[in-house]
Amino acid sequence: HAAPQFIVEDINSFNKALDQKRYFYTDIVKEGIKLYDNKKFKLTKPHELSYKEIKDIATEEFNKCYPFAIGFMKYAYIALEDGMNELGAFQLHQACERLYYSIELVFVNYRPKSHKLKDLESKCKKYSHSIASVFLHHTDFEKHCYDLLCRAYIESRYNKDYVVTKEELTYMLQRVELLK
């Protein structure tokens, strides 16, 4: 079991974020996470955001998330050059995760809690047909590479039998470039 975590935030900041429908804060309320209640304050109900507010929040969230994806891609290329293919697959998984998060944040102001690329891809496909064609599943090689990428988050670090070839990592990088 995970140890409890404490987040200290003043009520005004919390309510401002809640009012703006920031996913982290709305999830706290939606999931019924226990908050200290001294009975002096009430939680704000989120208001309907204007188009400008939605655009500003989407831009801010994108600008925080997308650069991480680009950084992870950069390190995946470095790992490829250095022959550290499993590390490259891990970095590439992280890049994909951040790219999918960026898409969700822009379209619905929400970041899923999942690290599972199949789940993230499934959520994002509805926004663009091109997302559905990033990872092809026509050949055994394409299916195998996608499977390697999906497993990289855990197995690249903990499974001694997890192996990625230069050819596989190169192919995965080419596909993720399309997502970028």
Model features per residue range: what roles?
Residues A2-D82, E86-Q91, R98-K180:
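Catalytic core of pol beta-like nucleotidyltransferases
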